[in-house]
Amino acid sequence: MRFSQLYAPTLKEAPSDADLVSIKLLIRGGFVRKNAAGVYTYLPLGLRVLKKVEQIVREEMAAIGCQEILMPIIQPAELWFESGRWDDYGPEMMKFKDRHERDFTLGPTHEELLTSIVRNELRSYRQFPLSLFQIANKYRDEIRPRFGLIRAREFLMKDAYSFHTDWESLDKAYKDFYKAYGRIMERIGLKYLVVEADTGAIGGDESHEFNALADTGESTLLYCDCGYAASDEKAEYMMLSDEDPDVQEEKALELVETPGVRTVQEVADFLKVTPEQIVKSLLYRGKEGFVMALIRGDQELNESKLKAHLKDQTLTMATLEEVLENFGVPIGFIGPVGMNDKVKIVADFTVKPLRNFVVGGMKEGYHYKGVCLGRDFSVDEWFDLKLAVEGDPCPKCGKPMKMTKGIELGHIFKLGTKYSEKMNGYFTDENGENHPYIMGCYGWGISRTMSAVVEQMHDEHGMIWPLSIAPFHIIITMVNPSQEQISKVGEELYELLKEKYEVLLDDRQASPGVKFKDADLIGIPLRITVGKKLTKGLIELKLRTEKQLVEVSISEGYDSVLETVEKLLKKYDPAKVAEVD
């Protein structure tokens, strides 16, 4: 490919609204262009990278016997009503009506659609197991699209689904996908961490996330030297033992005025107590009405755990208006004492040992102190609701957990019979009895992989692409292509090298400085410079990851160039510059 013919509009500066290094560099390097919040066009360089990521994923899917299909983006609402997820999935689902007033969605995922297809085809146990995948655009109406390709409204994803007659077969497929995802990470060259994960709106019995490590990642990951690792949404907390309750004698319940204080710390300072002696009351609205969740004042509530325990993905925190309208009190003073019996009260286990604690007074400007469980209010259900943080004891060994950040690229689920039972997906076994399919699903973010690689592999000059997905392997920079000898050698090298490598020939009439800066910005692994040293019979080779140049003589032909190129590309390792701990 000749640079003079390549549509790669590079920029000196990134747009002011680009919030991560990856999207700044991808825009500056001419890989993508933003069309709207969370919506991007892939230009030729970006599409080359995207296609290479796709190819790696396809090869790993083929290696485990997963067959490729292509499903429609538009899905009828009826399928989602069958599964019960039309309302449960949440506001991220893009819904619309056609001209006949029929409801449809732009698919955020395809469990329902594929189940509706195979339930009419897979009837006998002899047809199992079966694994199918597609690579296609997905759509989610993110409330705040951000981080470039990482949190977009339209994105490219590989989603696979497996169908089984027994759990042993699902376990094998799950392990196959687990290993395949590890190989994808390794082939791309990413540093990564696999963690136990929350199943969220997808549902199921077991789930793992594959995260590319990045300080700018959205995912918070907790891990321990013993091998335990989980997302903060999933990480269990080693609760205080019921055998160590607060030994204080019960005090009288007292409603005290707390003028002008709302936050936990303000209440603690005013009442001269610690945040641990305050219980926060968080009100949520769900399918079955209001739910009050109680958590200690020094802790944060894990909404994912709350949704999972209550089996309600529609739970959202009640608004100021809803609290005032239904309970007649501002949100900062809501509490469990005297709460309406119709409101379900759930609490984190760490609240159970407390005695004489502080809660909202159900009256503006007031709090209760001296509150005791059982005497002053009752809890309907106890759960682990705490958002685990760095330093919390590991649930497996008790040692303090460590924390890192990551970008979720892969997510695998054991769905079990959640969809097959609801959508009448049954097979007949060898005894003629009917059973629901046992399913798994396995997602991989193709487009966000681009951003994850750039987040890990870049420097102050630009991107540093791994060889496996680089838009080109080599760029030949002709310093002054109008000079006959430079042009001749550059063209000869281009014709020779493109037989084995993907080569970009920079034949533009531009200054050497512009060409060198563009080569670094675009991040091509190896640069060959044909310039002023040609008068001495020399050309210069430089890896994107290194500062030093390698001079190679071409006085006796190009054999030494071929040998040096092969040697340099073998040692090329952008992971060494990955900006992660």
Swiss-Prot record:
Homodimer. This is Proline--tRNA ligase. Pfam families: HGTP_anticodon (PF03129), tRNA-synt_2b (PF00587), tRNA_edit (PF04073). Its EC number is 6.1.1.15. It comes from Kosmotoga olearia (strain ATCC BAA-1733 / DSM 21960 / TBF 19.5.1). One of its GO terms (biological process) is prolyl-tRNA aminoacylation. It is an enzyme of class 6 (ligase). Belongs to the class-II aminoacyl-tRNA synthetase family. ProS type 1 subfamily. Catalyzes the attachment of proline to tRNA(Pro) in a two-step reaction: proline is first activated by ATP to form Pro-AMP and then transferred to the acceptor end of tRNA(Pro). As ProRS can inadvertently accommodate and process non-cognate amino acids such as alanine and cysteine, to avoid such errors it has two additional distinct editing activities against alanine. One activity is designated as 'pretransfer' editing and involves the tRNA(Pro)-independent hydrolysis of activated Ala-AMP.
